[in-house]
């Protein structure tokens, strides 16, 4: 089956489009095989194809050889004819010079070819074309770049004596490494986008870096085996436990406490050392702030006598009367009073008949009845004047619309230097200087000696209620 596929793929077609399609389909089928199997199949077909040529064609006439040479030259020229854009190559007229070879028709060569079954002979010579098509698709470095998981030894290269003995094999090897047919196939545009040319599976992809034969045949030494073992910990190590024999896989284990350690009393020296150190006053003053932004020169100063005096809370004045309580006392007479029937009647809510305050007589009458005298009465001029709506002042301006045109002067105005100066924010001292001012609570000596007046002393007294 594999030979038939290679033969079908290598057979030349006279139609250019058909040839391109058959070459692409066969290339995709061939590339699906691993590169190792392709190399082995190629060498096997090389040996099988050369043996029948030696045994079956010992006395091949010169006419058949010349005809084969012409066929090979035509096959080599076919890739140039397959390109459609090259219009000047279509009328290739120099081939008319081969017409005199048709004079060999009257000779007995056709009978000899028919007697020797030339079609079967041509079929035996067909693998040479398939080998040319397949070997040009193989990579030149296929003998070196082999997956180590499939084979440990590289396939043997053809010997020089074998290549020198057979000139056909020499040409085959040259065509294999030159890859003349593979290059034009790769230069053609893709027929279908998005579909890969071949499927990737284990063994047919080439490694990034070729693996050397020495690395594949390397033997493990005793030194490497010893270095591969995990590092052991000495038996004199303090945590001498089973899980500490090897450095990997350590666990957090609580140490066992002996019973004498539980009932032992610490000495006075240990108790004194266990107490936290007491900071001296000078150490606290010299200690810098925990905040890195504060300067080291700033220190906490001792409070002045004035600050200590102000820190004492003020006492309550003896004449101070607190605010009146919200609770009101009710007298006993009010609690023991009895309501009269009239008060009880007035305490009830007003009962509405059908949701109205008054009874309705006719539907056209208003809800509240109007007395006849009010309906006959005539309003006075004062009542008529008050009934009219208040007129708008003569200087009244209605509300301006939300959209109004902006004047030309407003749109093209420029800020004066004075306005720009006023627009700048006020320059103030930095916050850090004001915040960390050590003299912020310092009082002037004159303010400490000042005496308040009689009026100020009276205003400072709380209100007497």
From Swiss-Prot:
Residues 1-140 are annotated as: Disordered. It holds the Pfam family THEG. Transmembrane segments: none annotated. Keywords: Repeat. Residues 1-29 have a biased composition (Polar residues). THEG repeats lie at residues 174-192, 214-233, 260-279, 297-316, 333-352, 373-392, 409-428, 446-465. It comes from the Eukaryota. Residues 40-70, 114-137 have a biased composition (Basic and acidic residues). The keyword Cytoplasm does not apply. This is Sperm microtubule associated protein 2-like. It comes from Homo sapiens (Human).
């Amino acid at each position: 089956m594999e030979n038939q596929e290679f033969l079908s793929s290598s057979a030349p077609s006279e139609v250019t489009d058909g040839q391109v399609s058959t070459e692409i389909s066969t290339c995709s089928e061939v590339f699906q095989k691993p590169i190792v199997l392709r190399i082995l199949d190629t060498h096997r077909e090389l040996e099988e194809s050369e043996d029948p040529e030696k045994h079956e064609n010992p006395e091949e006439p010169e006419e058949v050889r010349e005809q084969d040479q012409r066929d090979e030259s035509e096959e080599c020229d076919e890739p140039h004819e397959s390109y459609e854009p090259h219009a000047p190559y279509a009328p290739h007229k120099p081939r008319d010079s081969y017409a005199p070879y048709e004079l060999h028709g009257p000779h007995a060569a056709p009978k000899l070819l028919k007697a020797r079954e030339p079609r079967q002979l041509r079929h035996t010579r067909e693998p040479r074309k398939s080998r040319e098509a397949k070997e040009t698709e193989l990579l030149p470095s296929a003998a070196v770049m082999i997956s180590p998981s499939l084979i440990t030894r590289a396939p043997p290269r053809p010997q020089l004596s074998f290549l020198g003995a057979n000139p056909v094999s020499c040409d085959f090897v040259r065509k294999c490494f030159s890859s003349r047919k593979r290059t034009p196939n790769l230069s053609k545009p893709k027929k279908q986008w998005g579909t890969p040319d071949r499927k990737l599976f284990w063994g047919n992809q080439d490694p990034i870096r070729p693996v050397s034969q020495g690395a594949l045949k390397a033997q493990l030494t005793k030194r490497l085996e010893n270095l591969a073992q995990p590092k052991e910990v000495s038996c004199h190590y303090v945590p001498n436990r089973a899980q500490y024999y090897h450095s990997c896989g350590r666990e957090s284990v609580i140490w066992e406490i002996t019973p004498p350690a539980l009932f032992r009393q610490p000495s006075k020296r240990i108790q004194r050392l266990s107490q936290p150190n007491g900071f001296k006053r000078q150490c606290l003053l010299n200690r810098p702030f925990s905040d890195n932004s504060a300067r080291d020169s700033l220190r906490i100063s001792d409070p002045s006598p004035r600050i200590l005096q102000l820190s004492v809370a003020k006492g309550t004045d003896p004449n101070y009367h607190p605010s009146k309580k919200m609770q009101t006392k009710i007298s006993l007479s009010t609690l023991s009073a009895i309501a009269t029937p009239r008060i009880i009647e007035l305490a009830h809510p007003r009962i509405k008949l059908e949701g109205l305050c008054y009874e309705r007589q006719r539907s056209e009458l208003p809800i509240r009845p109007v007395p006849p005298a009010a309906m006959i009465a005539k309003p006075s001029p004062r009542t008529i004047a008050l009934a009219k709506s208040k007129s708008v002042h003569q200087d009244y301006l209605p509300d301006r619309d939300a959209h109004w045109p902006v004047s030309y002067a407003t749109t093209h105005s420029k800020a004066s230097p004075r306005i720009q100066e006023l627009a700048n924010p006020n320059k103030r001292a930095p916050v850090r200087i004001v915040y960390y001012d050590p003299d912020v609570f310092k009082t002037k000596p004159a303010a400490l000696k000042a005496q308040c007046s009689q009026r100020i002393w009276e205003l400072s007294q709380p209100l007497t209620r």
